[in-house]
Amino acid sequence: MPVQGSQRRLLGSLNSTPTATPKLGLAANQTGAQCLEVSIPDGLFLSLGLVSLVENVLVVAAIARNRNLHSPMYCFICCLALSDLLVSGSNMLETAVILLLEAGALAARAAVVQQLDNVIDVITCSSMLSSLCFLGAIAMDRYISIFYALRYHSIVTLPRARGVVAAIWVASILFSTLFIAYYDHVAVLLCLVVFFLAMLVLMAVLYVHMLARACQHAQGIAQLHKRQRPAHQGVGLKGAATLTILLGIFFLCWGPFFLHLTLIVLCPQHPTCSCIFKNFNLFLALIICNAIIDPLIYAFRSQELRRTLKKVLLCSW
């Protein structure tokens, strides 16, 4: 992840400097301005990561176990869970290494720590990119299933889904490696921000279009059965509420992180922006919260998956 300054948090922990850069974030503001800084304890950070890790491991295990779930839709959901798993796991690993370095329980040279930091950054960045891509893929899959229902199984085949999955993983790893290598270039930050905005617009357009189709369908059924308008309005309100929750969670969890990147480009030295930079760990914690919420939205709502999950848990005992 892009940072401002010559040190990242792992190196700062190794050198035991009091002004070490927060995890993958920006250096503290030295202007003396009063800032609202939300501190995220390492224990809370590890706890959030552990919850996300367990949830997403269960999703992957359930989908892998049940052959009925080996469909394109669940393929994308499984890969989303795997991406979220890597996001949480990489941040837990970094936090654990930092704690060990600060406690003196782990001895390592600066060069080794730098390489480890680079590897963790690549894993974190690639898993974030792939997570966003799979959210878009799930939205596209649902869109095709609604608007091209009769041709869905000929359009979205398992081999094509696997090809999309492979392309997303390869592209995520490639671009994340380039982003980490050239993190101090403005173009890199702009590319990340544009990518986030593109995914946000794509998801909003697709889900709004699906909501409109659902309302039209409900209206047609109401007219067919000569029902009153409240039934149609109820469907519209329920769909709008679901859409607001889905896109709202996406924006609230991912938006601050990309706002952080945008401000690095627009006002890297401004005191107000520097105050926002201090809360980078909070923004990262929000992304991990999104990794906790994703299984609840996309996976655990499936009865088939829940039944398989119960079998997985019973077998583990």
UniProtKB/Swiss-Prot annotation:
Any matching Pfam family: 7tm_1
Signal peptide: none
UniProt record similarity statement: Belongs to the G-protein coupled receptor 1 family.
Cellular component aspect of the GO annotation: plasma membrane
Cell location: Cell membrane
Keywords recorded for this protein, A-Z: Cell membrane, G-protein coupled receptor, Glycoprotein, Lipoprotein, Membrane, Palmitate, Receptor, Transducer, Transmembrane, Transmembrane helix
Mode of membrane association: Multi-pass membrane protein
Stored Gene3D superfamilies: Rhodopsin 7-helix transmembrane proteins
Molecular function in Gene Ontology: melanocyte-stimulating hormone receptor activity
Name this protein carries in UniProt: Melanocyte-stimulating hormone receptor
Free-text function comment from the UniProt entry: Receptor for MSH (alpha, beta and gamma) and ACTH. The activity of this receptor is mediated by G proteins which activate adenylate cyclase. Mediates melanogenesis, the production of eumelanin (black/brown) and phaeomelanin (red/yellow), via regulation of cAMP signaling in melanocytes.
Keyword flag Transmembrane helix: yes
Spans through the membrane: 38-63, 73-93, 119-140, 164-183, 192-211, 241-266, 280-300
Lipidation (S-palmitoyl cysteine): C315
Keyword match Transmembrane helix: yes
Residues in the Extracellular compartment per record: 1-37, 94-118, 184-191, 267-279
GO BP terms: adenylate cyclase-activating G protein-coupled receptor signaling pathway
Segments on the Cytoplasmic side according to the record's topology features: 64-72, 141-163, 212-240, 301-317
CDD domains on file: 7tmA_MC1R
Organism: Presbytis comata
Glycosylation sites: N29
Assembly and oligomerization: Interacts with MGRN1, but does not undergo MGRN1-mediated ubiquitination; this interaction competes with GNAS-binding and thus inhibits agonist-induced cAMP production. Interacts with OPN3; the interaction results in a decrease in MC1R-mediated cAMP signaling and ultimately a decrease in melanin production in melanocytes.
Matches recorded under InterPro entries: GPCR_Rhodpsn (IPR000276), GPCR_Rhodpsn_7TM (IPR017452), Melcrt_ACTH_rcpt (IPR001671), MSH_rcpt (IPR000761)
